[in-house]
Amino acid sequence: MKDLAEYKNEIHSCSKCGLCQSVCPIYEVTKNDCSVSRGMFIMLKGLLKGELKMSKKLNRYLDLCLKCGACTKFCPSGINIVDIIASAKAKYFQSHPMEKFISFIQSKLIFGLGIKTLGLFSKNITSQKFDKKVIYFGGCGGNLKGNKSVISILNACDIEVITPLFDCCGIPFYVRGDKNSFEKAKQKFINLIEKYNTREIVTTCASCEKTLKSYNIDGLIVKNIFEYIREQNLKLKLKKKIRATFHKPCNIENYNDIEWILNNTENLEYIQMKNFDKCCGLNEIFKLSDYKILSKIPKEKHNNIRQTNVKTVLTSCLGCEAALSLYSFGKYKVCDLTEFLAKNITQ
């Protein structure tokens, strides 16, 4: 993670065109220019010039950012806005002890998830010889859910799966601005994969995939499981007919593979919801001070799901799965796409 001062040129290259306003979910709700990247960059310019201080008020606006990356995708100047906001958060984090205390508690909770649960973990099919070998990065979700789904699908793709017990990829620390904890998570990952003779990593979570790729480790290949399914042209057939919709996580980098699966799985009737690729609002759900305003984002997603009249909502990000489940109110079930396929396809 770079220091904020290293982004000086990018911050000054913002043309104030306002395209970010048209795609920012937070601006759509608040209509406050300080809550969108254009307004934030004006404040960050003042911060770098010494005209402003890193105050709680400025941090509040930084905190409003969902880190969905919609502004980055539409920015004509190609500015990586999410990384700049994260660096600004890191600057605030360094000078505020309470932020460090909260992150310390968070790290204890996250790194404490590395406990295997009986019955959730399995091994490769011992009677089969595989053409390929990959390492499965489960992260927080893999440690809680197990690896059965991943192994069964990848074994069907003629791929052997190595399953070390990884810790969190570090993305919660990154968005919070806890640079030290993020670097610690990265180093723990590097130390673990160095024990194995393969440099190909597979994950089922879009946020984990994007974070691991951001490590920029030489020779490391990071893919999501859906790439392998499509590469092998794996025939997928559900045991019974199921109608489902899909929420596209903001961090997903290759939706084409998932789209292929949704449209080529026999007995799966895929109903695309309105704004299926719009942020679920995960980063704002627990910000109680702005709850009345920010709860509109997940509520809109819930309403879009309800309009499809389905009982099954699929996604491919642990955070999105948690956020969508929180607002489901028992009206539908939210499932990880990998687990859904492993549970419902015919063998």
Residue ranges and their predicted role:
Residues 29-30, 206-207, 228:
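Short glycine-enriched loops at secondary-structure junctions
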Residues 134-136, 243-244, 313:
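Conserved hydrophobic helix-helix packing surfaces used for dimerization/oligomerization
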Residues 131, 240-241, 310:
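Phosphate-coordination loops involved in phosphoryl transfer and adenosine-cofactor binding
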Residues 41-216:
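Iron-sulfur-cluster electron-transfer modules
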Residues 9-27, 59-79, 249-251, 277-278:
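Cysteine-centered iron-sulfur cluster-binding motifs in ferredoxin-type domains/subunits
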Residues 78, 139-224, 253-347:
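Cofactor-cradling patches in redox/metallo enzymes
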Residues 225, 231-265:
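C-terminal amphipathic alpha-helical segment
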Residues 1-60:
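N-terminal cysteine/histidine-rich coordination modules
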